[in-house]
C-alpha cells in the first residue's frame, strides 16, 4: 500500500503541468495526507480514492484558463503558425445540392488564401484575407475585387457561410466580452459554454454568440444570435478525429436555423498545421495567378 502511495506521489512530482496553481497543489497534498491516514483500507477502496484524486486533474489545464484563453486556443487549433488544408464543401438545399473541393493556406489569424479546385465551373475562384481586408477573384472576370464592408455579410460560394465568417478570425477576442456560463462533463471531457457579448461600439452584426468548447479546445458548436437574441444560424462539429497530428473537428455543419433543410458542411480531407507557406502566397499576384 505504501509503495502505491509513493508512486502516486512521484507521479505528481514528475508531472507538475497537471497542477498549475499553488492552490491546486495544496489541495492535492491534503488529499494525499488523507489517503495516508487511510492506508489500512482495502486495496479496492484505495484505488477508488486514488482515482478521485487523479480524475479532476485530467482537465486542470483547461479549468485554470479564462474564457478568452479557451477560445483563443480553440481558434488556433486548426490554424497553427501556418497551415495547408484540403477540404470538401457540400451545400444542401430542398431542391438541389452541390459538392466542391477547396484548398486553403493560412498564417496566424490575419492571413488566409482559399481557392476552389472543383467542379470545373468554380475552379480558380478564390478569396484572399490580409488583416481587415479581403479580396475575391473569379477567373471569368480576370481581376480581383476588394470586398467593401457592405458585402461581407453576403454568401460565400452560395453556401451558408458568409465572407464575414471567413474574415473574422480573432474578432471574438477583440470586440466581445467573453465569459464561461456553464460547464459539464460528457464522454470524459469537460465541456465549456462561453457567451460572447459584443462591446457597445463593436463593428459586428450579431447580438451575441455562444460557443461550446471541449477541454482539448475542440469547438463543438457556435450559435449566432441577432440583436433581439433570436438564434439565426449554428456551426456544429459533426465528427472529431486526429488529422495532421492534432485532434480537431474534421466535419462541421453550418445550419440556417430559420430553414432547417438548408445547411453547408465543410470536411477536412488533408491538413498540415506546420506547413512552410511562402510570403508570396498571401499576395494579390498569388490570388489571381493561382501560384
Model-predicted regions and their roles:
Residues 25-46:
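Bacterial N-terminal signal peptides that target proteins for export
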Residues 51-59:
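C-terminal segment of classical bacterial N-terminal signal peptides
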Residues 63-84, 88, 97-98, 123-126, ...:
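Flexible, processing/modification-adjacent segments and terminal tails
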Residues 74, 102-106, 236-242:
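Extended lipid/amphipathic-ligand handling interfaces
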Residues 83, 87, 112-114, 209, ...:
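One face of beta-strands
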Residues 85-113, 117-120:
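N-terminal, post-signal-peptide region of Sec/Tat-exported proteins
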Residues 146, 167-169, 189-283:
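Gly/Pro-enriched, hydrophobic low-complexity segments
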Amino acid at each position: 500500500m505504501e509503495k502505491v502511495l509513493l508512486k502516486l506521489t512521484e507521479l505528481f512530482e514528475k508531472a507538475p503541468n497537471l497542477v498549475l496553481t499553488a492552490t491546486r497543489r495544496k489541495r492535492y497534498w491534503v488529499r494525499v495526507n488523507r489517503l495516508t491516514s487511510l492506508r489500512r483500507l482495502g486495496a479496492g477502496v484505495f484505488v477508488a480514492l486514488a482515482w478521485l484524486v487523479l480524475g479532476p486533474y485530467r482537465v486542470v489545464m483547461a479549468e485554470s484558463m479564462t474564457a478568452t484563453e479557451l477560445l483563443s486556443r480553440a481558434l488556433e487549433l486548426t490554424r497553427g503558425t501556418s497551415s495547408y488544408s484540403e477540404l470538401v464543401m457540400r451545400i444542401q438545399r430542398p431542391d438541389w445540392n452541390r459538392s466542391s473541393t477547396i484548398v486553403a493556406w493560412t498564417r496566424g489569424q490575419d492571413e488566409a488564401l482559399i481557392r476552389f479546385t472543383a467542379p470545373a465551373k468554380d475552379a480558380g475562384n478564390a478569396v484572399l484575407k490580409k488583416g481587415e481586408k479581403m479580396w475575391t477573384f473569379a477567373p471569368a472576370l480576370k481581376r480581383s475585387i476588394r470586398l467593401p464592408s457592405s458585402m461581407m455579410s453576403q454568401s460565400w460560394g452560395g453556401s451558408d457561410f458568409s465572407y464575414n465568417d471567413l474574415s473574422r478570425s480573432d474578432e471574438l477576442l477583440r470586440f466581445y466580452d467573453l465569459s464561461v456560463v456553464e460547464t459539464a462533463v460528457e464522454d470524459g471531457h469537460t465541456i465549456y459554454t462561453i457567451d460572447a457579448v459584443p462591446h457597445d461600439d463593436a463593428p459586428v452584426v450579431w447580438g451575441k454568440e455562444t460557443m461550446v468548447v471541449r477541454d482539448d479546445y475542440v469547438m463543438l458548436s457556435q450559435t449566432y444570435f441577432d440583436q433581439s437574441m433570436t438564434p439565426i444560424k449554428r456551426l456544429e462539429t459533426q465528427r472529431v478525429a486526429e488529422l495532421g497530428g492534432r485532434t480537431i473537428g474534421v466535419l462541421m455543419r453550418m445550419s440556417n436555423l430559420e430553414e432547417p433543410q438548408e445547411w453547408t458542411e465543410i470536411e477536412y480531407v488533408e491538413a498540415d498545421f506546420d506547413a512552410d507557406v511562402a510570403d508570396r502566397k498571401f499576395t494579390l499576384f498569388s490570388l489571381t495567378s493561382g501560384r
